[in-house]
Regions:
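PEST-like, low-complexity acidic/proline-rich intrinsically disordered segments
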Residues: 1-14
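Soluble acyl-CoA-dependent acyltransferase catalytic core bearing the H(X)4D motif
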Residues: 11-28, 42-43, 47-76, 80-366, ...
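Detector for long, low-complexity, acidic/polar
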Residues: 32-34
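Short, surface-exposed beta-strand/loop micro-motifs that present aromatic residues
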Residues: 39, 142-148, 397-406
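Low-complexity, glycine/alanine/valine/leucine- and proline-rich hydrophobic stretches
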Residues: 364-433
Length: 433
């Protein structure tokens, strides 16, 4: 490393190099890549951090060289956002400006990091590279990477990607391909970057699905709490036994049509607990939106190896009073019915809605739940074993993420979300079954 930047606090010092641009290590297609309205609604950077217990002196070079080779397959990630003649956003694959890559070292052991599922933003910023042009849409890189070595021999890999390029499932495919190439193997997944099958219909046809995409207001004045109080982002532990008890409760009070999944019952618990912790008024509309992968619903039209966004957000909508008064089995039925509504027509309606209306942020009366429990990041073996932990940061107050907890029975779950300080203890008590 030639030049370094020091990032220091009372506990942790990270010394990192100036970024170098990693380019695809071979010829790649040129031109521009179509972005769907779904992609354009996802214009936000997402940081993730992976911890690895061991590496060696070559870890940085191996990962950097593998990045260059994997970008031959995932070349749009080396491009930049641009606008076409109609003012629509695309990815410019002509210039190939590359992916900023940073090498860093920390003054501690990797165990000192503790639980990284929801890192404080000040700590996270030490281990991921945020490009200074991040807010300049047509200049900023779509992907950055930072490898940080620790005194114990372990390392972290911090990745920041623009969500317009990929959802969680496609991100897993990219990371697996990167790791395979680092181990000297060919990539087992060949991505397809054609997104034109997600073009909106002319004219738009939204129909009965409008309420699934609309926003709801805040008549409970919850926004004031968020503005006046610190927002506490925290990981709440739900063990497998609690989850089994909850599933039994959700199917024994006579309201359930059938058994429900861990995701559904956990979503019901969190939605109800958050609604009560935020002290929503009985007639306040509360909205639960669930990230649902629509790949299985679009098999006839989706190209093999599709790389991009393929999620929709079906909605459950009711008043806070209705939600709190009903048995949890009724809440799980709401959620199951919302998920069951996702078919090709729903997906097409969502695309049309996103093309017709400008994006508006969700208000605090809404909760958006995403599950990372099924994302198999344990196979990201760059040559020294897979990652022990996965973490994130920069969640919005409306976001909630379910993650797997490391446990013997593999059934424990971490619920990660942010709340106003005054609501944290109440939420904690309500999710303890």
């Amino acid at each position: 490393m030639v030049a370094f930047e020091n990032t220091t606090d009372n506990v942790l010092t990270v010394e990192r190099s100036l970024p170098v641009e990693v380019l695809p290590g071979g010829e790649t297609p040129r031109g521009s890549l179509f972005l769907s309205s779904m992609d354009c609604w996802a214009l936000a950077v997402v940081p993730t951090l992976y911890t690895f217990d061991r590496g060696d002196a070559n870890v940085v070079d191996v990962i950097k060289q593998a990045l260059s080779r994997v970008l031959v397959h995932y070349y749009p990630l080396a491009g930049r956002i641009a606008k076409n003649s109609l003012g629509k956003l695309t990815v410019d694959c002509e210039k190939k400006l590359g992916v900023p890559f940073v090498e860093a070292s920390a003054n501690c052991d990797i165990e000192d990091m503790g639980d990284i599922k929801m890192l404080d933003s000040d700590i996270l910023e030490k281990f991921v590279y945020r490009d200074p042009t991040e807010k300049m849409l047509e200049v900023t890189p779509l992907l950055t990477a930072q490898v940080t070595r620790f005194k114990c021999g372990g390392f972290t890999l911090g990745v920041v990607v623009n969500h317009c390029m990929t959802d969680g499932i496609s991100a897993i495919d990219f990371m697996n391909s990167w790791a395979e190439i680092a181990r000297g193997k060919p990539s087992s997944f060949i991505p397809c970057h054609d997104r034109t099958f997600l073009k909106s219909r002319v004219p738009p046809q939204i129909g009965d699905h409008y309420n699934d995409f609309a926003r709801v207001g805040d008549i409970s004045n919850m926004t004031t709490s968020w503005e006046r109080e610190p927002t506490v982002f925290k990981s709440f532990h739900i063990n497998g036994e609690k989850l089994a008890t909850l599933k039994k409760m959700a199917t024994t009070d006579g309201q359930a049509r059938s058994n429900c999944s861990s995701f559904v019952v956990l979503s019901a618990l969190v939605w109800r607990a958050r609604t009560m912790a935020l002290k929503m008024k009985p007639h306040q509309l509360t909205q639960l939106l669930i990230y649902v992968d629509f790949r299985p619903k679009m098999k006839e039209h989706m190209p093999d190896g599709y790389f991009g966004n393929a999620v929709v957000l079906p909605c459950c909508l009711c008043t806070a009073g209705e939600l709190i008064d009903e048995p949890i089995s009724s809440t799980t039925e709401r959620i199951k019915k919302a998920i069951e509504r996702v078919d090709e027509d729903f997906v097409r309606s969502a695309i049309d809605y996103m093309d017709k209306y400008r994006f508006e942020p969700y208000r605090v009366s809404s909760l958006l739940i995403s599950s990372w429990m099924g994302l198999d990041y344990g196979d990201f073996d760059f040559g020294w074993g897979g990652p022990r932990q996965l973490g994130t940061g920069n969640l919005l107050p409306t976001d909630c993420v379910f993650m797997r907890e490391e446990s013997e029975n593999k059934k424990d779950v971490a619920v990660v979300l942010g709340l106003p300080l005054s609501a944290v203890n109440t939420f904690q008590e309500l999710v303890q079954i």
